[in-house]
A protein has these predicted regions:
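Alpha/beta enzyme core
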Residues: 2-84, 88-127
């Protein structure tokens, strides 16, 4: 029987109150994006939470028209991959495509579109 190796842990008084994912999440297979295994995804746009968590990725979608400043702010504080919302509901076409380009240039791992996204918008994003 193999014993679990001891893994040293470093914390400080200033960063001890972080949003922690359930330990059982480490038992799932997860998904691999660009060679990085992601088991836990934190769904938030709150930059204070994005800066203080132990999730493997951030899902940053919100019910408003995507704004470059919000995506930039999230990307600045995120220390893990970000999956960025770029519209698809009311925000479509060239605007969604431009937000996708901005998200990619800021370092987002992927973009996320809403359910009612049209095929034309997907094609525009894919260009």
């Amino acid at each position: 029987m193999m014993t679990q190796p001891h893994i040293p842990s470093v914390m400080s008084d200033l960063r001890q109150d972080i949003v922690q994912m359930p330990k059982v999440i480490k038992e799932c297979s997860g998904i691999r994006i660009y060679g990085r295994r992601i088991r836990s995804i934190l769904f938030t746009t709150d930059v204070s939470i994005i800066a203080n968590h132990d999730a493997d990725a951030i899902l940053a979608v919100y019910p408003f028209t995507p704004i470059p400043a919000i995506i930039k702010s999230i990307m600045i504080v995120a220390s893990v991959p970000v999956l960025a919302g770029v519209g698809g509901g009311l925000t479509t076409g060239v605007r969604s495509a431009n937000m996708s380009l901005l998200s990619e240039s800021e370092g987002a791992y992927a973009v996320v579109v809403n359910g009612p996204t049209t095929v034309e918008t997907i094609k525009e994003i894919n260009k």
